[in-house]
Amino acid sequence: MPRSLKKGPFIEFKLEKRILDMNSKGEKKVVKTWSRSSMISPDFVGHTVAVHNGKTHVPVYVTENMVGHKLGEFAPTRLFRGHAGGKAEKGGSAPRKK
């Protein structure tokens, strides 16, 4: 269920303040954050935000297409290594007919 329009988007106060300060100074530094639920606003475009995925901080370069999405969408928390190989890779597992 989406957030009510009456409330407006959630952006962590400290994160928004850092981005606005960097915009006023014209700086481009990597900003670390644990706030995966913060919405990406148009002020974030062009900055790199390091979003925590539970283990490390994943650098996310914000583009115009990302505005309106949440930071956590771009830092996956699970690593998929593929399904088990087994007999299918070695050859046919069905017995041959004579």
Swiss-Prot record:
Q: Which Gene3D superfamilies match?
A: 30s Ribosomal Protein S19, Chain A
What family does the Swiss-Prot or TrEMBL record give for this protein? Belongs to the universal ribosomal protein uS19 family.
Q: What is this protein called?
A: Small ribosomal subunit protein uS19
Organism (species): Chlorobaculum tepidum (strain ATCC 49652 / DSM 12025 / NBRC 103806 / TLS) (Chlorobium tepidum)
* Gene Ontology MF annotations: rRNA binding; structural constituent of ribosome
Any GO BP: ribosomal small subunit assembly
Q: Which GO terms describe its cellular component?
A: cytoplasm; small ribosomal subunit
> Is the keyword Transferase assigned to this protein?
no
* Task of the protein: Protein S19 forms a complex with S13 that binds strongly to the 16S ribosomal RNA.
| Keyword terms | Ribonucleoprotein, Ribosomal protein, RNA-binding, rRNA-binding
Question: Which SUPFAM superfamilies is this protein grouped with?
Answer: Ribosomal protein S19
Q: What is the lineage of its organism?
A: Bacteria, Pseudomonadati, Chlorobiota, Chlorobiia, Chlorobiales
